[in-house]
């Protein structure tokens, strides 16, 4: 049994990266002593229950640096004005716990690449440092500062480091930044039990995920407006986590919903309620372009829905590049969903493409090789 440290900058945004973090902890617990380092307000056990992850919280050693509680609250409070500051959080975590990492046999970073003094497995959702090397972004001057403090050098990502990415698209972006291409290990999304037959489902759309500006929930409402204007009586159900950092945006979304009797918003619904919605509605919609993987899109597929998403990022892989499910604008999304509603065809993609056992096996194999 090895001592393994898992580094995760924060669980407070309650999204796909946090599913990966808690799934990694769960995958390694049976064979290793796992310690989770994070700067979070969010309780790992409660979040694991919401995501349906079988995590033994009594066996998980959760450690937060001194002052982490007020720091997490402060960063959540200012996030509406300054953004999530994920790279800063990673820098703070790395520098405050770095002196403890030498006591571990292996470090696993589940929140992107970082410079580490030990052998490591690093799971990249999207490169957080040296973003000025990308063709369409520089990350601002602060990202260059954070990069000097905590970014790995390309040489650091060779022997002794197993680099993984959540999609082939993210692997390509990482290669552009560092000259090293990670292996692809898609995040875990199990088929959801209780899937209704197609003709027993409601003529409605579900939007799942963090209620945040980058998810473009208001565009989803506009898309449903457009589909209804074409004569299709579809409802919209928005359900997801509402982190404190996005409270102003959530109020704007709820204000739009209040003006439309066919739109419902549910904050922080339990997992059972989320699965009920996914298994009883026909269509799933994601509106964030260049989603690094697309956990919500994968959940739509896993629950037997017909899923739609922007024609960019890792979600192209989730939807197998199907042109009639991928859109480039609100108007094109209206066209595709209206056509699907008229045809009323059931989904064609299998629900078990991204099962959690595949993910757990991939993580355990990567850790075994690194050890």
Mark where each language-model region is:
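Glycosyltransferase donor-sugar binding loop
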Residues: 235-251
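Conserved donor-binding/catalytic core segment of Leloir-type glycosyltransferases
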Residues: 164, 189, 195-215, 221-226, ...
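Membrane-proximal helix-turn-helix segments that form the acceptor-binding/catalytic region
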Residues: 139-163, 169-175
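Nucleotide-activated donor-binding/catalytic signature segment of Leloir-type glycosyltransferases, i.e.
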Residues: 250-272
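Short hydrophobic beta-strand element within catalytic cores of glycosyltransferases
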Residues: 306-309
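A charged, aromatic-enriched C-terminal amphipathic alpha-helix characteristic of glycosyltransferases
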Residues: 341-371
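Aromatic "clamp/platform" in nucleotide-sugar-dependent glycosyltransferases that forms part
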Residues: 289
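Active-site donor-binding segments of glycosyltransferases and PAPS-dependent sulfotransferases
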Residues: 35-109
């Amino acid at each position: 049994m090895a001592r393994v440290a898992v580094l995760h900058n924060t669980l407070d945004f309650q999204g796909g990266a946090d599913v990966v973090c808690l799934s990694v902890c769960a995958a390694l617990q049976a064979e290793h002593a796992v310690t989770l380092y994070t700067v979070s307000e969010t309780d790992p056990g409660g979040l694991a229950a919401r995501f349906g992850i079988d995590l033994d919280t009594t066996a998980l050693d959760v450690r937060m640096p001194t002052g982490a509680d007020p720091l997490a609250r402060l960063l959540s409070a200012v996030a509406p004005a300054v953004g999530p500051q994920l790279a800063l959080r990673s820098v703070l975590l790395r520098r405050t716990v770095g002196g403890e990492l030498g006591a571990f046999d292996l470090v696993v970073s589940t929140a992107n690449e970082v410079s580490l003094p030990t052998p490591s497995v690093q799971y990249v959702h999207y490169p957080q440092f040296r973003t000025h090397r990308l063709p369409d972004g520089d990350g601002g001057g602060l990202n260059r500062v954070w990069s000097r403090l905590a970014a790995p050098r390309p040489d650091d990502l060779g022997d002794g480091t197993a680099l993984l990415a959540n999609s082939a698209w993210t692997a390509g972006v990482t290669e552009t930044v560092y000259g090293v291409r990670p292996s692809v290990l898609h995040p875990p999304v199990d088929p959801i039990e209780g899937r209704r037959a197609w003709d027993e489902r409601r003529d409605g759309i579900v939007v799942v995920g963090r209620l945040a500006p980058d998810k473009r929930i208001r565009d989803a409402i506009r898309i449903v407006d457009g589909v209804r204007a074409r004569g299709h009586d579809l409802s919209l159900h928005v359900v997801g986590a509402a982190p404190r950092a996005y409270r102003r945006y959530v109020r704007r979304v709820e204000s739009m919903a209040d003006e439309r009797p066919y739109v419902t918003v549910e904050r922080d619904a339990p997992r059972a309620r989320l699965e009920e919605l996914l298994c009883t509605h026909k269509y799933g919609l994601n509106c964030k372009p260049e989603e690094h993987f697309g956990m919500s899109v994968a959940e739509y597929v896993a629950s037997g829905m017909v899923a739609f998403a922007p024609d960019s990022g890792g979600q192209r892989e989730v939807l197998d590049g199907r042109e009639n499910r991928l859109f480039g604008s609100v108007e094109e999304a209206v066209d595709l969903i209206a056509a699907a509603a008229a045809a009323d065809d059931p989904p064609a993609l299998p629900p078990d493409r991204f099962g959690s056992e595949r993910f757990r096996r991939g993580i355990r194999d990567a850790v075994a090789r690194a050890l």
